[in-house]
């Protein structure tokens, strides 16, 4: 336990000794802050505004600030009376000369220092300068203030400049940050744009805006697409015409098919000529001059077949090119019926040739 007592006693003694060694040089001169406007030590050392020591229970003095005693001797006598009952007031006398010099140098600035009970501005000159100073830059650059200048904004500016000052000093203007941010960047600062005449609405907010990209190529593209949609139908119509032409070509072979029976007759008659006697040749020559009833029948059949093929061709073309198209199935059926008739005619001709 004695060790602890020694430690405690030594620490307390060192703290007291450090307080006793405090001098005026360790304290900075007044720098515009209330913490450095005055200083009072245990030994009676003091500088700055010590007028509050003359008052009782914080009551202000009857004398004005300029008429207050500012000499170092009066302050020393006042402090000596106040701290007469102090234990260390008579023991510490270090640095009195330095304190006197500092009090002399700070006497002019102490005249402008306000009462310590009423805080914060230091002198009246700075207060007057701040009173005539302009508003903060954020408020002067606000578009709301610019917009109000044209509409009787002078009154509002006067009210803004007539902010109630604390203790005769212009305190820093601190508006509500939310209101300031809402007011800043108002739409009244935007240039007035004439409304468009082609259907675009005027933008009512910064977040909603309309962009005109000029004439668009979409109309030209759509017109080309519509044109391409009509072209295949025209091509199909031309294709139908080709089918009609093809129909005439497919139905034309009856004319070409009509020739082979004659060639066959000549081909058959050619090899049979040497075997036939001369009277047979004479009979053939007479038959050529006066055709036999069989040949007449064959010729009649040829003429009837040719007329039927012509009528079928014309009917097929009319059916193909008629506006009321009856469908591809009936057209195919009509085309398929005609070759059957042709083949039947060819068979009949062969039978006639055999009979001859």
Swiss-Prot record:
Q: Where is the composition biased (Basic residues)?
A: 78-87
- Identify its membrane topology class: Peripheral membrane protein
Provide the positions where the record notes the PTM N6-methyllysine. 5
Q: Which GO terms describe its biological process?
A: cellular response to type II interferon; positive regulation of actin filament polymerization; positive regulation of pseudopodium assembly; regulation of cell shape; Rho protein signal transduction
Biased amino acid composition, Low complexity: 133-143, 287-315
S-S bonds: none
Q: Where in the cell is it found?
A: Endomembrane system; Cytoplasm, Cytoskeleton
Q: Which GO terms describe its cellular component?
A: actin cytoskeleton; adherens junction; cytoplasm; cytoskeleton; cytosol; endomembrane system; microtubule cytoskeleton; phagocytic vesicle
Acidic residues biased stretches: 345-356
Keywords assigned by UniProt, alphabetized: Cell shape, Cytoplasm, Cytoskeleton, Membrane, Methylation, Phosphoprotein
Which superkingdom, per the lineage? Eukaryota
Does Cell division count among this protein's keywords?
A: no
**Ranges where the record places region Disordered:** 51-102, 122-182, 257-356
> Where's the CRIB domain?
27-41
Q: In which tissues is it expressed?
A: Not detected in any of the adult tissues tested. May be expressed only in fetal or embryonic tissues.
Which GO terms fall under molecular function for this chain's record? RNA binding; small GTPase binding
Positions with biased composition (Basic and acidic residues): 123-132, 318-344
Q: Subunit notes for this chain?
A: Interacts with CDC42 and RHOQ, in a GTP-dependent manner.
The function of this protein is: Probably involved in the organization of the actin cytoskeleton. May act downstream of CDC42 to induce actin filament assembly leading to cell shape changes. Induces pseudopodia formation, when overexpressed in fibroblasts.
Similarity field: Belongs to the BORG/CEP family.
Q: What is this protein called?
A: Cdc42 effector protein 4
């Amino acid at each position: 336990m004695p060790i602890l007592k020694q430690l405690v006693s030594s620490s307390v003694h060192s703290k007291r000794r450090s307080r006793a060694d405090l001098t005026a040089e360790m304290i900075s001169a007044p720098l515009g802050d209330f913490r450095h406007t005055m200083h009072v030590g245990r030994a009676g050392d003091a500088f700055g505004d010590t007028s509050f020591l003359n008052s009782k229970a914080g009551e202000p003095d009857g004398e004005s600030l300029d008429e207050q005693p500012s000499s170092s001797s009066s302050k020393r006598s006042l402090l000596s009376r106040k701290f007469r009952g102090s234990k260390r007031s008579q023991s510490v006398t270090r640095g009195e000369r330095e304190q006197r010099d500092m009090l002399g140098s700070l006497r002019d600035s102490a005249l402008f220092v306000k009462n310590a009970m009423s805080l914060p501005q230091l002198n009246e000159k700075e207060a007057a300068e701040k009173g005539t100073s302009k508003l903060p830059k954020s408020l002067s650059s606000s578009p709301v203030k610019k917009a109000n200048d044209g509409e009787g904004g002078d009154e509002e500016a006067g009210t803004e400049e007539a902010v109630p000052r604390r203790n005769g000093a212009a305190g820093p203007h601190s508006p509500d940050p939310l209101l300031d941010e809402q007011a800043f960047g108002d739409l009244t600062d935007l240039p007035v744009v004439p409304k468009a005449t082609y259907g675009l609405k005027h933008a009512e907010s910064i977040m909603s805006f309309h962009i005109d990209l000029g004439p668009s190529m979409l109309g030209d593209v759509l017109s080309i697409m519509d044109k391409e949609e009509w072209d295949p139908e025209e091509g199909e119509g031309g294709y139908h015409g080709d089918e009609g032409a093809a129909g005439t070509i497919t139905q034309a072979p009856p004319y070409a098919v009509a020739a082979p029976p004659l060639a066959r007759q000549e081909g058959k008659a050619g090899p049979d000529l040497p075997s036939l006697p001369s009277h047979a040749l004479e009979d053939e020559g007479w038959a050529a001059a006066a055709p036999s009833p069989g040949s007449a029948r064959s010729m009649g059949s040829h003429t009837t077949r040719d007329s039927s093929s012509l009528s079928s061709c014309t009917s097929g073309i009319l059916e193909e090119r008629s506006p009321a198209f009856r469908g591809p199935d009936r057209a195919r059926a009509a085309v398929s019926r005609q070759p059957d008739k042709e083949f039947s005619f060819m068979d009949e001709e062969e039978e006639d040739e055999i009979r001859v």
